[in-house]
């Protein structure tokens, strides 16, 4: 599997990097950590080309270099990568420019597969979308944003599962809230949820929510299948059938001490644009991490 962790700053991206690497370890996934900076001007791009053989002299995006330096130090400190015994510093001259707006360095992983550090410049949605397509990414991990449209566009336009790291504290005692129904992505979400629960030793609440007064048979069958799968996987769990508004029930159940896992909406892109989707609304409303599985 391949994970992409998007980081923006040393001050705000620690929870994203922390949780992202822990989940990647659970999946034994290859990981790319990407910083997306502002678009470089045509003049700056030509300067980058002249300096591509020695990126120590590249001052075009010093913030990006500093953020990758911080990520590198985190990886070394937590033993996610094998550091250079002669020099534990982040060596920028190892960065290789692959495009006008992209450079990278690949490191040998210890608890995951290969770890890549990537710097891109340009529109964040387009850059992350291109990186996901380029690397065949399975899960993109991002921090929560106050810009509602940004999360909406990431969920709609990026062709991978999306893990939104919101209000995460590594010392908090979490449970896992798993949304179960008869939608196409539910079985994949259940399998992802099991991997996360195993890695973090989480109790799982597999919840099926109906906004009508009756549970249709397909919902009941999905709940039974989830119960069987969790039991066979050896996961400590409970299965619940609940009547009520989906967003409200998820919010009241999750609070701030759950990690939510749910399948992506099957609505058309046009319908999502005008009306939104349940996963998007849950990720906005609930004050906890949420994994939306595609």
Residue ranges and their predicted role:
Residues 73-140, 231-270, 288:
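Structural beta-alpha unit
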Residues 11-13, 17-19, 117-170, 254-294:
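Gly/Ser-rich helix-loop-strand patches that form or flank binding pockets
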